Structures are given as structure tokens and as C-alpha cells.
């Protein structure tokens, strides 16, 4: 049976995808065949074949980025060390270990789901401007995050969520494969408006919130909080 595991890594970091037999195991590197590949596309990540030192069949995206430890393999640890994680690495990886002396019987099969994350920049909220006498427009920008964010606008007076129908979000992938987001909020003009823009990264369970007040060119102090928007409030906004 194939074991299933999950692991999370930040963009640019190194991560270990675990594939190991119970402690105390011993293996002969001339007997075991080890294959790491992506589960869906079957892209070759790395492998170990006895008396075959060349890794010419490794996909170029993983060459020199994916390694197993020979010393670890002797102990039954066939884990994969993946360096410099990218957003494109977010997928399922399959580890398969076979024994030649056992008639190429499967010794170990593990599927590891890698979740990739990157922190969004602290949002920048533009000073409000008035396209008309009875309307105010705010713009909130945040870049270089992963996965795709949720964007909320908040009435800072009572911390209630503004109707999402009032905002227009543009989210796109940049050259690094990370997400940039621009949200434009249009609200009716009132004598005093105190609003905040919240960028939520669900995978990191992190929200970045910046406020803006009418008459102020500088936003309130930036802050990072863990889930300041309650589930009930979110549901009410959708």
C-alpha cells in the first residue's frame, strides 16, 4: 500500500520529502532501485539504480535540485531533499523502492503532497480620491505571495466586513510564478471613513491588514495577525 503524507515549504527554502522504512532497516545499495517522480505527469525527479551513477534521465527542472543521501539509503531512508522550492513544485511526488533480490518486489511506496507558500508584501493602500462628488475610491496592492490570496475590505470603526460587491480584485501571476493582487474599493462618500485592506494567505493562516482614513495620506501602522476575520464574518461576506 502507498503511504500518503503532506508537507509545506516556503518559496526559496529547502524541504525534505519523507520516504523511509522503519528504524533499524538495512539495505544494500547494489540491491535497491529507488525512483522519485511526480505523481500526475510522471516527471523524473531523481533515482538510484545500482552500478548506474548517471542521472541523465532526471528532468531539467530537478537536476541538481533533488538529492537522496547514500548514507541514508543504507539505513532505509530514501527521503528526497529538494532545494530552492518554487511555486511549480506544488504537486504530489511519488517515492518507489524495489528490491532486486526479492524479484523486484515493492519494498516501499510513499506519495508526498508538497504545499508551497510565500508571504505577501504588506499591503499598500492609496490615499482615497474622488472620481465624483458622492464616491470615494481606495486601491490596495500586495505582491509576491502564494497561493492565491483572499482580499477583504474592513470598516475599521466596528471591524465589520464591507460588501465584496463594492470591490474589484485583479489577481495575476508575475514572472516569478507568484501572485500580485490589486483591489479597488468604491464606496459612497461620508464625512469620515476609516477602512482597512486585508490580504489573507489561507495556507499560512496569516492576514496582513493596513488601514486608511479620509484626510490621511499615511495608512495606519501595518500589522500582521492570525485570522483576525472570524469564520462567521467571512461567511457573511460571501
Task: Write out the residue ranges for each language-model feature.
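Beta-sandwich strand segments
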Residues: 27-29, 102-109, 207-212
